[in-house]
Amino acid sequence: MLLWMVLLLCVSMTEAQELFQDPVLSRLNSSETSDLLLKCTTKVDPNKPASELFYSFYKDNHIIQNRSHNPLFFISEANEENSGLYQCVVDAKDGTIQKKSDYLDIDLCTSVSQPVLTLQHEATNLAEGDKVKFLCETQLGSLPILYSFYMDGEILGEPLAPSGRAASLLISVKAEWSGKNYSCQAENKVSRDISEPKKFPLVVSGTASMKSTTVVIWLPVSCLVGWPWLLRF
């Protein structure tokens, strides 16, 4: 008698488990929109009595929508903070049957905005060897962002990946940069964009050391009679 009761219980539990299949979690709307709409789908055995099902949603193993009859989960204007691993759970009314979907990885990274490039230098007239700083900044875009600097299409130095939304490059001026276009590029795993090109200032002839040199001409004392100053060029 006890054996029959065990067998009947096993059969009953097996049939209960087959009332509905393992759920599948999917994203309904396009990844190009800012809204997030998820649907938890399961198939109920048509030969079994109708069962009242409840849907729960989880993000990174934390519940975000507890048992309800709604198989949909919606976030309006979702942002990067809503990225994560999502999962749904379907269970029967009495809670005896519970099935989980596989994880769905939602990545809500945003594209970089067009970077703004500025040139900073102390010298009034740039000469070869003077130090200048290129500063590339973006207002929007998921981190990390990779920055690259260009002079007439040729990369300057190595690409930079700082922790923030700006990168700077300190570099010595070259004579051939005179009047050429310079720009910077910002790139993350979603998109890339390039700043508006700008003209590099004219580079004066000579080097930075020559530009700052004072030339002193020594004349005989007899030539300086009546001259209260020393000639400098």
Curated annotation (Swiss-Prot):
Q: Where in the cell is it found?
A: Cell membrane
Q: What are its GO biological-process terms?
A: cell surface receptor signaling pathway; immune response
How this chain sits in the membrane, per its record, is: Lipid-anchor; GPI-anchor
Which Gene3D superfamilies does this one have? Answer: Immunoglobulins
User: Which chain regions cross the lipid bilayer?
Assistant: none
Tissue specificity: NK cells.
Xref: Pfam families: Ig_2
Task: Output the InterPro entries linked to this UniProt entry.
Answer: Ig-like_dom, Ig-like_dom_sf, Ig-like_fold, Ig_Fc_receptor
Q: An example Gene Ontology cellular component term from the record?
A: plasma membrane
| PROSITE patterns assigned to the protein according to its UniProt record, in alphabetical order | IG_LIKE
Induction per UniProt is: By interleukin-2.
Q: Which stretch is the leader sequence?
A: 1-16
What superkingdom does the record give? Eukaryota
Instruction: Give the UniProt keywords, A-Z.
Output: Cell membrane, Disulfide bond, Glycoprotein, GPI-anchor, Immunoglobulin domain, Lipoprotein, Membrane, Repeat, Signal
Glycosylated residues, per the record, are N29, N66, N181
Q: Which GO molecular function terms does the record list?
A: MHC class II protein binding; phosphatase binding; protein phosphatase binding; transmembrane signaling receptor activity
The family database entries (SUPFAM superfamilies) matched by this protein are listed as: Immunoglobulin
PANTHER family xref list: FC RECEPTOR-LIKE PROTEIN 2, IMMUNOGLOBULIN FC RECEPTOR
Protein name in UniProt: Cell surface glycoprotein gp42
Please name the source species. Rattus norvegicus (Rat)
